[in-house]
Amino acid sequence: SYGSRTMSNTYSMTCAQCYDETTWSFSKKADAVVLTLGTNDNVEVDKGKITYAQMKDGFKSFLLQIRTKNPSAKIVWAYGAMGNGAKDCILSVLKELGGEANGYYYVGLEYNGDGGVGHPSVAANSKNAETLAQALKKIL
């Protein structure tokens, strides 16, 4: 999260990054919603800016918000491309929400910090994209 511009309070906007607060209609129904969140949240825990419990509550609240807007979509959390610090928290929340039986899935990505500032390289992103694509084929 970055100050007041969190995913939870900008999810319903068309382009919060552009400060366009026009509400998204959600009229088109998604088959899947894929998240790749958690790295920066875990850094905030490590820095002592938020607690593990706050991170977990935030994850759960956001997933429930997504579910409200996408009641029949598979919700897929793809994580690990920049480390696995929040993995246990993510898995715990997905389990609490009923896991795959309730349409919540986890896809582990491979860590590779060969890109800029610890980000994955182009090759790693390509490999993780293939991992996610294969997982979505199975899930959908």
Identify what each model region corresponds to.
Residues S1-A53, A81-D88, H119:
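Conserved SGNH/GDSL esterase-like catalytic core that processes O-acyl groups on lipids
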Residues F26, W77-A78, M82, G99-A101, ...:
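Conserved catalytic region of serine esterases and O-acyltransferases that act on ester linkages
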Residues D31-T36, K74-Y79, G103-G108:
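Structural recognition of the beta-strand scaffold that forms the well-ordered cores
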Residues G38, L64-P71, K95, A133-L140:
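Sec-exported extracytoplasmic/periplasmic mature domains
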Residues M55, F59, N125:
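Aromatic/hydrophobic pocket-lining residues that form the small-molecule binding cavity
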Residues F59-L63, I90-L91:
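Generic structural signal for well-ordered alpha-helices
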Residues Y105-V117:
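Short helix/strand-capping connector loops at secondary-structure junctions
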Residues G116-L140:
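Histidine-centered active-site loop/cap adjacent to the catalytic His
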